[in-house]
Amino acid sequence: MKTVNQAMRKKDAMQLVTGQPVYMDDVIPQDCLIVKLLRSPHANAIVQEIDTSRALLVPGIEAIYTWKDVDQQGRRYTQAGQTYPEPSPYDRLVIDRHVRFAGDVVAILAGKDEKCVDKAMKLIKVRYEVLPAVLDYHTALDNPVLVHPEENWESLAPVGADNKRNLCAHDESGAGDIEAVLAGCDVVIDHTYHTRACQQAMMETFRTYCSIDAYGRLNVLSSTQIVFHCRRILANALHIPKSMIRVAKPRIGGGFGAKQTSVCEVYPAFVTWKTKKPSKIIFSRYESQIASTPRHEMELHVRLGATKDGIVRGIDLYTLSNTGAYGEHGPTTVGLSGHKSIPLYGKAEAFRFVSDVVYTNHMSAGAYRGYGATQGLFAVESAVNELADKLGIDPFVIRQRNIIHEGDVMPAYYGQVNTSCALDRCLQAVHDNIGWDEKYPVRDMGNGKVRAVGMGMAMQGSGITSVDVGSASLKINDDGFYTLSIGAADMGTGCDTILAQIAAEVLECPLDNVTVLGADTDSSPYDSGSYASSTTYVTGKAVEQCAEQLKQKICQVGAGLLGLDERAVVFAGDAVMSEDGTQRATLAQIAAASQCGSNTALEAVVTHSSEISPPPFMVGAAEVEVDLETGEAQVIRYEAAVDCGTPVNPNLARVQAEGGILQGIGMALTENVTYDDRGMPQENSLMQYKIPARNDIGHIHVVFESSYEGTGPFGAKSIGEVVINTPLPAVADAIYHATHKRFYELPITREQIALAGQ
């Protein structure tokens, strides 16, 4: 292949590294209203009185909106970017009189500049009726304090939700008699694991610009992963027709799932729709830390039974998830905690997976890379590591005895057959590359330091089966180059480049001959958006099929120009030729002919959805140096092997893997969202919220052990999310080998390690 599976430079690389104006605030008019939000200091309260009279007198203030400007009995909406009907409940209003977490919106202010808006905000007087708050998610279910007592709360999908019980979702699934199987096992590992909420912490915070166009429509330019879902969300929130809204995205400075939720778009949209004036909102880092959509905190109870030879016979998993004040992504993230961890163990005779998602008066959780699988894999993989230790079996060996293989039906994965899998090769590659036999389990380095190793494996999905869709539109232009229009959002991942590579491979042209446009609800074909590890697999397949259709049309027109039957010509990349090569029509000639007196449009549009979601696989091993006296733990080496099918662009795939590994290490060791006894988030800046920098980590090495997925473009599967999952169990197991103490809660802090070392 000439372009696919080749390390091509990103199409936008030079513009980004040279600091060209490509992000939202770079490209919008600066003469617009500045929108800011007054937020509640209380975790649960009713706004009794709000006085904005003095604030409205501040010069430059255009408008201040409160709950009085929003129909409190109107239909609610969700900010979750999901295909309709969304599993997430409709539990929000633009401004609600009932504030449900410390940071919830009390008022929207709009003015000519930040100075006047900040001054006006200080002059607003609010009197609250402070209510008891649900701050412990263990006590949320059936608590007498209801987070959502309102009657206009609504759940569109059958996810087991009940707002009168603080229940956002409940589900049960299983196969076989799990109790009988566990009773017959030689050994059962039974533990409860706890993963904290953690922030996506993308460099570009939430931001949106809104204006009214010449047709009176609301135009929205937003840093979002989900332009089409965002249009529906805004229509639902503002109670206006979707036809009156256009949503587009510029370049995005990172998302990691945070921008799969419309966190900020509704507020400038509300202002602009009311005032008919352009407006923008840019969240500060403080706001992005205290009023965003962090990963769901989860508690996972695992019972895992096996034979004395280490064959896993049964897995019983119960997950309790804290969705916070609103239910965005609550019903769906929790499912992945079981359905993306249990299927790795193909010899299990029985499984049971039960989950509850509860409301609390914490900041609303949301989507974050890994989307629930991360939490579930930490628990299940940690249990398998403990099983290996208890039986005296090497962790790699016990997995080789249990893993699923190509052609196996995957347990807890909706009956799907494993259509492509190199998990066995991934295990061997990581085992060899890290020098496992020489380093396992721990080595004393002297001076109070030890080096230990740990490992884990992971899977994810490739899109959402039979739900989300990807689309592509492709046309040839008058000089013989192509324009690819997509609705997927490149958020720094390089999907514009990858999708162009797929088109270029089919059309046998240089990558530079394919220009990419997207995403824009007015001009792009419908696409669910960039999430659920779907872009390469789902949208990429649409691009491949679209390019094939366009190539066929080009051959039809070329054959007509040559006076030949369509079956007598061949496509040669830059031309259509007769089979013997004696006659030739160039792409430029064919494109020009299609634009003069032609009834044939040299354009193709394809929408694609997959009935299966083939999982990518990954194995990772961490070498961690631990100072037993100070508790400092540093990952000095991380080895990973990934099966993502055919890597369309190995360089970009490797960058994805390295970044995900770094995020996973942060979740294992430092990242944590905590609250004080009033429900106020404590880590409100990047000084308190510690994300690892590149120099905090030693050597990261990634290899690809490729299977071939026949349903993907050129054999490709996803890679975006699976890469974050292995560091959690791997680092935790390495620290166990260093300290001889198991940790069942993340992050594992320096203080905890120091105490264990003593």
Residue ranges with predicted function:
Residues 85, 97-98, 241-249, 273-284, ...:
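Conserved catalytic cysteine-centered active-site region
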